[in-house]
Amino acid sequence: MSKIIDIKTSIIKIPLKRTFITAVRSTNHIDSLAVELTLDNGVKGYGVAPATTAITGDTLQGMQYIIREIFAPVILGSDLSDYKQTLELAFKKVMFNSAAKMAIDLAYHDLLAKEQDISVAKLLGAKANSIVTDVSISCGNVAETIQNIQNGVEANFTAIKVKTGADFNRDIQLLKALDNEFSKNIKFRFDANQGWNLAQTKQFIEEINKYSLNVEIIEQPVKYYDIKAMAEITKFSNIPVVADESVFDAKDAERVIDEQACNMINIKLAKTGGILEAQKIKKLADSAGISCMVGCMMESPAGILATASFALAEDITVADLDPLDWVAKDLYSDYITFNEPNIILKDNLKGFGFNL
């Protein structure tokens, strides 16, 4: 196969329609780094990853440095057919930096698919071309949250991810306000983003059970490193508990599985460093009988396309890929149709189907 002869990076900033607020950060735009890999036959592959410093530690400048100074010397001149070995060698040279790894990993997959004249989704083995996403509701006061949930329901979303963890009293009050407000057909996913402690999480679960809400999952209630508390919550809860920030890579997945510290793992490519590591996590989870969902950072439509492609290939049906609802449709209309809540990949894509 062809050899990689050039690597370029560029910064992409995308404005949001509204401010995104969680227990750990607030933002009104998306910062991303794009990577362009060029083969000696002229074919170019693209990957885009978000700089979500509060979660992964990545910064735009740091990602550029890692790619230019650490990854490029390994990648340049390598044969595309040796991509697994090349990426393993490159990624071993630096700890963490998962977003920088994601951008490179995705650019490789874009090249691999283009060389076969197929989409990345088909390269990975996907049969379907659409997946249903929830919509995320930012942290805010109870009245604002209820209104934003109503807006989501009116936009045809049937799964609502409610950000919690910033103010526990508000979170408890919200449950009472939600009771009987929405149809049982609406599934709620509560994501604390590590904002609670063990006692608060147990109290929140007990409060849920007082009401008639259709609660599908509780996501990452406590600090990412508190696996003991995650295990105790999983044992205590009658609602599935999701590990998000606790699982970045396959080693993390092994730990939470061994400790029985979750019922489900949220796979995000910006945490795993791309598709190859995500596949390892999914395989481990399958072997242990643990479910998986896919999620994302507040990231570009290009990143959502990559995650949707992975999810479709792995038959993952629980998805939190709603940044498409936060940005202008013309940013992704060439490769995705978004009929809320359905994300539909366009037919006849080559690679991911986007150019930068």
UniProtKB/Swiss-Prot annotation:
SMART domains: MR_MLE (SM00922). Mg(2+) binds at D191, E219, D244. GO terms for molecular function: magnesium ion binding; racemase and epimerase activity; racemase and epimerase activity, acting on amino acids and derivatives. GO terms for biological process: peptide metabolic process. Its cofactor is Mg(2+). Its EC number is 5.1.1.-. Substrate binds at R25, S136, K161, V162, K163, N193, K268, C296, M297, M298, D320, L321, D322. CDD domains: L-Ala-DL-Glu_epimerase. Keywords: Isomerase, Magnesium, Metal-binding. The keyword Magnesium applies. Binds 1 Mg(2+) ion per subunit. Catalyzes the epimerization of dipeptides with L-Glu in the second position. Has epimerase activity with L-Ala-L-Glu, L-Pro-L-Glu, L-Val-L-Glu, L-Thr-L-Glu and L-Met-L-Glu (in vitro). Belongs to the mandelate racemase/muconate lactonizing enzyme family. Part of a large, functionally divergent protein family. Protein modeling and substrate docking was used to predict the substrate specificity, prior to biochemical analysis. This is L-amino acid-D/L-Glu epimerase.
